[in-house]
């Protein structure tokens, strides 16, 4: 452990033989946040913040929800440490040269917005100012290449006028990855606006695939075939159809994946149908999202794996429970979905909405027409005054 001025390293190097220490690569969790036990991991993290600690006035423990103070940490950083300067450490630094791999992204302009396209899912233009050619659906009545372009262009045009939630300086525009998938989860188009976060490339596809998957007529059968019939039964118990009769946004799927549903201080604290119950739930045991990827996750401990799940292409990089995607329809028939990732989830939702114009779900089957345990499911949520 080498942090600034080695403060965290020094704590780890002390004699903590009777406790679990983060240097053994074992994760820990706090099943009872009401007690005052202190984990070595938390002490190490706090030691690393010496000189760089968050101002007290903006820490999470300054927030009260229904009279309950949100915890920040169960420990305090040490008063001081005799730190070791990096230059005084023994040994010879080794700086291994790393060549940058060639990129699979090519400059392109979509709807007048400059960005990059993945050459695996589009024919890039010879000139960055020109549009790419996206892929047509192979399904009868599916999205054409021009319709994929239209959808991505509409989303891209909204992104450049959307006030970002995660960027400085204030007043910056959102920068996102935009993905459109077919009914079988195949990627029809990917576009990344300039300087969009790299992680969004994968997450945008996950979001699109999630909305498409849960909205498809075969969702229940597909989950059962993947050994996840428990979640199908839980959805049925909540009178949730996984037969294509409901159009699910990713915001709705996210609500149903929470360990407390409905969320809020006055909940009965039962879990959503796609979540493990409280007492069993943890960030390492979430529910359907993790169970779909668990086999490949374990396999990755012994070497690289080709894909995140053993599922078919519909969700073979897993599902996502963050908002920012909606299914796409033509003449009332599901033809795929659009997913957005790269800014706040409300901003992603807004940009996904813009992209879906012309291919929106019939209002009467949207998830916000469904009530689960007395609480309506959401469809999308937009920020107030979102445009620059």
Specify the residue positions occupied by each region the protein language model found.
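Short glycine-/small-residue motifs
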Residues: 21-24, 189-190, 336-337
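Sensor-regulatory modules in signal-transduction proteins
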Residues: 328-330
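Intrinsically disordered, low-complexity terminal regulatory regions
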Residues: 63-199, 203-215, 219-220, 384-388
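Serine endopeptidase catalytic core focused on the charge-relay Asp
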Residues: 38-45, 198-305, 351-354
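Short, basic/aromatic recognition patches
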Residues: 4, 13, 140-179, 204-205, ...
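Juxtadomain coupling helices with adjacent low-complexity linkers
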Residues: 27-108, 114, 141-149, 341-388
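Single conserved hydrophobic/aromatic residue that forms the stacking wall/gate
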Residues: 1-20
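Terminal peptide-recognition signature
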Residues: 19-22, 185, 332
């Amino acid at each position: 452990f080498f942090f600034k001025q080695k403060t965290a390293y020094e704590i780890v190097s002390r004699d903590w033989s009777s406790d679990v220490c983060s240097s053994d690569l074992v994760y820990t969790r706090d099943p009872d946040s009401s007690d005052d036990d202190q984990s070595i991991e938390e002490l190490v993290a706090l030691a690393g913040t010496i000189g760089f600690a968050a101002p007290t006035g903006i820490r999470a423990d300054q927030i009260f929800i229904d009279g309950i103070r949100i915890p920040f940490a169960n420990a305090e950083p040490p008063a001081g440490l005799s730190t070791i300067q990096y230059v005084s450490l023994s040994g010879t630094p080794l700086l291994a040269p790393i060549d940058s791999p060639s990129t699979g992204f090519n400059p392109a302009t979509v709807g007048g917005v400059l960005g990059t396209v993945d050459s695996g899912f589009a024919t890039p233009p010879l000139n960055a100012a020109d549009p790419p050619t996206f892929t047509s659906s192979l399904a009868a009545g599916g999205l054409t290449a021009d319709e994929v372009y239209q959808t991505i262009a509409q989303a891209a045009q909204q992104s450049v006028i959307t006030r970002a939630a995660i960027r400085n300086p204030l007043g910056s525009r959102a920068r996102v990855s935009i993905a459109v998938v077919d009914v079988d989860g195949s990627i029809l188009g990917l576009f990344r606006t300039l300087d969009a976060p790299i992680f969004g490339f994968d997450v945008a596809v996950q979001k699109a695939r999630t909305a498409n998957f849960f909205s498809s007529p075969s969702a229940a059968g597909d989950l059962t075939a993947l050994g996840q019939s428990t979640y199908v039964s839980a959805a049925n118990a909540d009178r949730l159809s996984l037969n294509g009769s409901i159009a699910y946004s990713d915001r709705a799927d996210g609500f149903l994946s929470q360990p407390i549903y409905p969320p809020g201080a006055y909940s009965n604290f039962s879990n959503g149908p796609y979540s493990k119950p409280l007492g069993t739930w943890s960030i390492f045991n979430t529910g359907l999202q993790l169970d779909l990827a668990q086999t490949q996750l374990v396999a990755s401990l012994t070497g690289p794996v080709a894909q995140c799940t053993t599922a078919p292409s519909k969700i073979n990089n897993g599902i996502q429970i963050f908002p920012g995607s909606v299914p796409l329809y033509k003449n009332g028939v599901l033809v795929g979905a659009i997913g957005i990732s790269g800014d706040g989830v409300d901003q992603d939702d807004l940009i996904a909405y813009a992209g879906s114009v012309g291919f929106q779900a019939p209002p009467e089957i949207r998830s916000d027409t469904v009530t689960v345990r007395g609480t309506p499911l959401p469809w999308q949520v937009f920020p107030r005054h979102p445009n620059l």
